[in-house]
Amino acid sequence: MESAAKIKEILQAAELEKLPDFIAAYQEDPRNGVQKLVALAQKKLDALEKEKQRIENLKKYEKEYAGYTYICGIDEVGRGPLAGPVVAGAVILPKDCNILYINDSKQLSEKKREELYDVITKEAVAWAVGYASPERIDEINILQATYEAMREAIGKLSPAPDLLLNDAVTIPGVNIRQVPIIKGCLLYTSPSPR
């Protein structure tokens, strides 16, 4: 019989997809410590299922506009700097994309943002970033500089998007259908990178 410490090591090394196997292997073990580990594994599994459902719910807009080939999510990245550029990100994800834990970047830890950045940029059909300098912000104001950064990001995408899901704005000077969504970065899975 394996020690509870060894079983704990097995759980810590187990990938999320292997949790059902872990639970099946140890659920009949009568030891208290092992049952706590099984309960922990079940809690992780329940959280994973809840996250999968949350991601599925986020696909509302992608499903609604399924007739479009390249749906792009676009958002500014931390608009409102006192000193620094305004940055906008645009991304087109594949239609079958299921990246877990995507969320508004302000809702994520720095570590999780970095992990998701790596996954998103690897999985994306296309992604790009646009910038407007502090000097440009001073010239045209923060909102116009944000639009400029967004247009730059959109212009860098290849393939070009045929639909934009925007976080609460309509970007002037863009001849692509736009759907401005209030709190958009929380409501669809095509986020901007970082």
Where on the chain are the PLM-derived regions?
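Long amphipathic N-terminal alpha/beta scaffold segment
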Residues: D46-A83
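Short loop/helix-cap segments at secondary-structure boundaries that form the rim of catalytic
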Residues: T170-I176
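Contiguous, small/hydrophobic- and glycine-enriched helical/loop subdomains that border
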Residues: Y70-V77, P81-P161, A168-T170
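Structural signal for conserved beta-strand scaffold positions within catalytic alpha/beta enzyme cores
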Residues: V129-Y131, P180, T189
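Conserved catalytic/binding loops enriched for acidic/polar residues
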Residues: K6, A13-Y61
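Short pre-catalytic strand/loop immediately N-terminal to key active-site residues, enriched for Gly-Thr
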Residues: C72, Q178-K183
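Conserved small/polar residues in nucleotide/adenosyl-binding loops
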Residues: Y188-R194
